[in-house]
Amino acid sequence: MSGKTIFDKLWDQHVIAGNEGEPQLLYIDLHVIHEVTSPQAFQGLREAGRRVRRKDLTYGTLDHNVPTQDIFNIQDLISKKQIDTFTKNVKEFDVPAETHGGKGQGIVHMVAPESGRTQPGKTIVCGDSHTATNGAFGAIAFGIGTSEVEHVLATQTIWQVKPKRMKIEFQGHPQKGIYSKDFILALIAKYGVDAGVGYAVEYSGDAISDLSMEERMTICNMSIEFGAKIGLMNPDEKTYDYVKGREHAPKNFDEAVSKWEKLVSDSDAQYDKILSLDVSQLKPMVTWGTNPGMGLEFGEKFPEINNDLNYERAYQYMDLKPGQTASAIDLGYIFIGSCTNARLGDLEEAAKIIGDRHIADGLTGIVVPGSRPVKEAAEAQGLDKIFKEAGFEWREPGCSACLGMNPDQIPEYVHCASTSNRNFEGRQGHNARTHLCSPAMAAAAAIAGKFVDVRTLVTD
């Protein structure tokens, strides 16, 4: 009998009922909620006279609608209603949650790991597609719909069909100036935005082992843009070190680690598909079009029109042409933030590139830490001063300009170098034009006034 993947091990440990190949009932170890997808779920509980079954396994925060300047002055009526409703619901149902402007408030996919709630071996769900971020810890984590949010609140379980297993091997060691954001953008560009559909993706290889936990989260975060619902990695010493000492880390930590060490893929585990990517010669990545698969290494020419891939529409929307390169993009905005790249390490890398330089004339740059703990840690290092002296706006935590659900929207027809995860039409605002890249690449673009090869600015 062949060995098991980490995904198989975790799935089997959490199945309550059902046969393989059919929907199976899974027990959920952590349910994270935010203000956008939880209101209808709580209302459903209220109307049915139900309670939250496991309040101790539920955790909430505010992120999508929160302003990042005057955080309590919410002008948009829908945003205000969602925030007020969330605050009312978590109080009424006695659910642990970060308060608006509170010490732990931040993007949902950041505060769960930062608080120590995200741990190896867990099943984690949230009404948000980028929940896969938590898979970097060796957890099965995935996004769910609003009706499923209600089901988990009421039962602490969810029905799911087990996906197939894919292994992706990141081979080699990257050059300086190449980051995990480049890994995942290159993977999506190579294999496409649908390559992961129907799979739980396990990321492996020497290049993954070398990454910090923050960098690993970036890759798992964008599993969704690869088409997969679930992305995860085998836990190791870096995982345990990250969790250790955090508020909600296991009390008997050594005992927990002894269990976690068994939650790795066996050497003879079988996969339904195996893909690979050599990162040793990888160059910085930038997207040119309107989905994350429309990305190229810096210096490559934009491709000829391929109607099967909607290139013509993408070129029209982005106001670009085949044969151009990323350096020809007329940037007007720089956004460093989002659940993909707003962690302390991301801000540190961007600040290193900036140094004592100033952003180019005509550019607007905003830096939005993903959580209050990250903001405070960055300020303790003086990173906020580096950004502000360079001409960036230093904001309060939130989802910010990743999506057009709060005041931080990119102006119409403006090109934005963004460290977020999606470059769809209108994602950052009406007719906004998004170019995905790493934080260091965004910082380099801010200084130069256009996309440049960040490797020329890396000093250590």
Swiss-Prot record:
It comes from the Bacteria. Keywords: 4Fe-4S, Amino-acid biosynthesis, Branched-chain amino acid biosynthesis, Iron, Iron-sulfur, Leucine biosynthesis, Lyase, Metal-binding. [4Fe-4S] cluster binds at C339, C399, C402. GO terms for molecular function: 3-isopropylmalate dehydratase activity; 4 iron, 4 sulfur cluster binding; metal ion binding. It catalyses: (2R,3S)-3-isopropylmalate = (2S)-2-isopropylmalate. It is an enzyme of class 4 (lyase). Binds 1 [4Fe-4S] cluster per subunit. Its EC number is 4.2.1.33. One of its GO terms (biological process) is L-leucine biosynthetic process. Heterodimer of LeuC and LeuD. Catalyzes the isomerization between 2-isopropylmalate and 3-isopropylmalate, via the formation of 2-isopropylmaleate. This is 3-isopropylmalate dehydratase large subunit. It comes from Lactococcus lactis subsp. lactis (strain IL1403) (Streptococcus lactis). The lineage of its organism: Bacteria, Bacillati, Bacillota, Bacilli, Lactobacillales. The gene is leuC.
